[in-house]
Regions:
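Hydrophobic, aromatic-enriched interface-forming segments
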Residues: 104-205
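Flexible, glycine/charged-enriched surface loops at secondary-structure junctions
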Residues: 221-225
Length: 290
């Protein structure tokens, strides 16, 4: 049984309970909203009520002997112990703490105020319980989506880190050293060996990785586009969130499609892919033996 206070609810206790749900810590637990001290004393966990913080089962921050900066949301986030793995969620929790403790007022359309908007007109009426449940459901869905995205980003970063990079004109004829799939051989050649163009190739069967994960590591990324059944070649931007890149793809005879801005091209499967790029005043053709 989880107990939190009745009356008006805020983002901190709503988020605290949602976090416990998303991390499967309170499956099917009964949630009671009350300030009745007898019920609070018999709770398995108290959140934002009760006047005690012990970091184990009691998570209130209103008592005068608590001098920390956390709200009940931050207390539960510390209890879960996963903050280092989820920086985006950690930032959101910090903002919830700031709002609830008065350290910083968030913007009108911030998550905190969206949660508060779920309160019923009569906070002690019959609709308030359902409104609280709706707010927790919304928070849980949002937090679950953030968790899924951060888990995915971690996986994609690991794939990018395990992808070998080859440079035009180097390692020709060497055994394949693509760490993701050492059963496939691939090599690259180019008209201008001194161009120093670096290529990352992700084999088929590996999840599509955004090129931003290769910033500062290479200039081109080639990977299989499962949806379109072809190879995708993309230029790597110089900075995250920008299109500007060292290279620009040009139309070549075996390309299915090359975007007019030159940041992506599609190429058929089988044999050799020849990619023509603009590199300053040079226009080398890079051939990738698939």
């Amino acid at each position: 049984m989880i107990v939190t206070h009745d009356g008006i609810f805020h983002a901190d206790e709503v988020t605290a309970i949602a976090l416990l749900q998303v991390w499967d810590m309170v499956a099917n637990a009964e949630i009671i909203r009350t300030r009745n001290m007898d019920i609070i004393a018999n709770a398995d966990m108290t959140i934002d009520v009760g006047g005690i913080y012990d970091g184990v089962s009691k998570f209130d921050h209103h008592q005068t002997d608590y001098a920390g900066e956390l709200s009940s949301a931050g207390m539960i986030w510390e209890y879960l112990g996963v903050s280092d793995n989820y920086p985006t969620i950690s930032q959101l929790i910090r903002e919830v703490d700031e709002q609830d403790t008065g350290a910083k007022r968030q913007e009108q359309h911030h998550y905190c105020n969206i949660i508060s908007s779920y309160n019923a007109d009569d906070i002690y009426g019959g609709e308030q319980g359902a409104a609280f449940n709706d707010a927790v459901a919304f928070a849980a869905k949002y937090l679950a989506a953030l968790k899924k995205r951060e888990d995915r980003e971690k996986m994609l970063r690991e794939i990018a880190d395990c992808t070998a990079i080859k440079t035009v004109g180097e390692n020709e004829g060497d055994p394949d050293f693509d760490m993701l799939d050492d059963s496939e051989y691939w090599s690259i050649t180019g008209e201008y060996r001194y161009a120093g163009i670096r290529v990352a190739r992700i084999p088929k069967g590996i999840r599509f990785v955004p090129v931003e994960y290769f910033i500062d590591r290479c200039e081109l990324v080639i990977q299989w586009d499962e949806g379109q059944g072809c190879w995708s070649v993309q230029t790597v931007p110089l900075k995250k969130g920008e299109f500007g890149a060292k290279l620009k793809l040009l139309n070549s005879k075996n390309a299915i499609f090359v975007h007019k801005a030159g940041f992506i091209g599609k190429y058929p499967d089988g044999g050799e892919i020849c990619v023509t790029v603009q590199d300053g005043g040079l226009c080398p053709t890079i051939c990738i033996e698939m």
